[in-house]
Amino acid sequence: MNDIYDLTKAIDPTRPVNDASGDGHIKTDIWAVHDYTREYDRLVANHTFKPGVEPYRNEPKKPFLAKYNGQPYMVDEMGGLPWIKESERSSSWGYGANIDKMEDFYKILEAQIDAFKACKHVVGICYTQLTDVEQEKNGIYYYDRTPKFDVARIKSIFEKIPSYIENPQDLSDWKAK
């Protein structure tokens, strides 16, 4: 992994390198984790930085992994809320229990977005996922790309997060070690 990171930087030193989506970091410019937690309080606790405590990790017990070094911190997989047709539930899955009421889906999604908005060190999130795939039914859209939900309502929930950072950290002297 170190060699691939170094080669990528040699080819294009301006390009940030994410060595492993969802943690497992060896050498990285972007600290990315996955968190499908649904509860606001747990998400805030997971992603609020505490002095002297390493940030949330998906793989905390692997001593060979890199330590957090001030990289931009992203949750590059969140959401994962399964909305599965009853006829497909035996052959499909999502992250966590299926959501039976559409209004519950919106409430959970909004709580997740509110939680990440409250976490000042989280500089980016990515909802998993845009569309259903063969066996994974976490999409905002069905496999055939038709919407499962009120897309305008989904958009309004995501628009609670600003599209820019009001007080960005000065990362001009930051480098991965």
Question: Which role fits each region the language model picked out?
Answer:
Residues 1-145, 153-157, 167-174:
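Substrate-binding/catalytic cleft of secreted carbohydrate-active enzymes
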